Amino acid sequence: SYLLYAALHYGARARAYYVNSAFQPAFELEDARRLAGELNADMKVLPVDVLASETVTANPPDRCYHCKQMIFRTILAAAEADGFTVLLDGTNASDDAGDRPGMRALRELSVRSPLRECGLTKRDVRMLSRDAGLFTWDKPAYACLATRIPTGQPITARDLAVTEAAERDLFSLGFTDFRVRMVGRSAKIQLPAAQMPRLLEHRQEILQRLGPDYDGVWLDLEGRG
């Protein structure tokens, strides 16, 4: 978000690309469209069928690498067709390159990460975004839906849809910064310890909403964050 703002603020010829796949919840596309509208930015939505890749759906430890390859090759092709020669992404200095297979895909495809290259951390980006008046400045970090499914467990369209619905239900009840992870056919809810009392207050409603899609609903007492 901030990278797009900065590019436009300093007069760069830029176009935003949003990859729409089964791994992204609907609200992410809504937020991207809102941001593009507020910045008067040109944004192109590119559909990518990540579930068509057996390597990705097998969910190996380096799934993110293969998925990033699919995503960024699609963006690169679109950008080249649009007359662009440089592709930038929003990775920042807080992202651990040594622990992310997806980073390898970025390097191999020559995708540049200006925020990271300039040493801007996640906190720096939030503060700069706040100063710029971007609504995304305090938006909780959100990893793709595939991260909710244990490594080695095949990823299916049904599991992704169930996960998205479960997290949407919890969000509608006022919970924030949480994850609903699959453990077998059960749901494990991870959220900050401070929100646990509220979750127990809504216990019956949560069971009614999530129960039909899962064999069980668990609360991770270790909390999140």
Language model region names:
Residues 1-131, 172, 187, 205-214, ...:
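ATP-dependent adenylation/nucleotidyltransferase module used to activate substrates
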Residues 139-159:
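Internal, active-site/partner-interface "lid" segment
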Residues 195-202:
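Short, conserved charged micro-motifs
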